[in-house]
Amino acid sequence: MQLDVSKMEIRKFKLGEDNSLINLWKEVFPNDPPHNEPSSVIKSKLEIDDLIFVVIENGELIGACMAGYDGHRGWLYSVAVSTRSRRKGVGSKLVKYTIKELAEIGCVKVNLQIRSTNEEVSSFYLSFGFSVEDRLSMGAFVGKNL
């Protein structure tokens, strides 16, 4: 499939696109743990805000980014591009669009987390000007550890 990036539409996710987004996330993140089940994550996210952005090309959802904003910092939580649409500028356009949208609501800094072993994705974000910061990321499951 030849991708025409000039015909891509990048916008906020719309209700009714759930199945397309779920299918994309299952394709891109096949080994996600059960607590990251896409349908419940989407539902929970939309109860908080609408910071889910999608890329549509020829009527097909080929990319998505779930973002967050705490009133100061923004976050890129999940960036996904269908495997057949990668290395064609989709992810770059999506990340730039998401950062622009975050800036428009007052965001002054954008953060993200990736696995330290994921060198390909690390290089992708470094190319935007992200840098590795001296931070320690911690997490605990509510109800199990807390």
Region locations from a protein language model:
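Conserved N-terminal entry element of GNAT/NAT acetyltransferase domains
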Residues: 1-16, 145-146
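Acetyl-CoA-dependent GNAT
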Residues: 12-78, 101, 132-135
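A short, internal acetyl-CoA/4′-phosphopantetheine-binding micro-motif in the GNAT/acyltransferase core
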Residues: 79-86
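Conserved acetyl-CoA-binding loop-helix of GNAT-fold acetyltransferases
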Residues: 87-100, 127
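Conserved GNAT acetyl-CoA-binding A-motif
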Residues: 102-114
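Conserved beta-strand-loop-alpha-helix junction that forms the acyl-donor binding cleft
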Residues: 112-121, 143
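Active-site/acyl-donor-binding loops of N-acyltransferases
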Residues: 128, 135-144
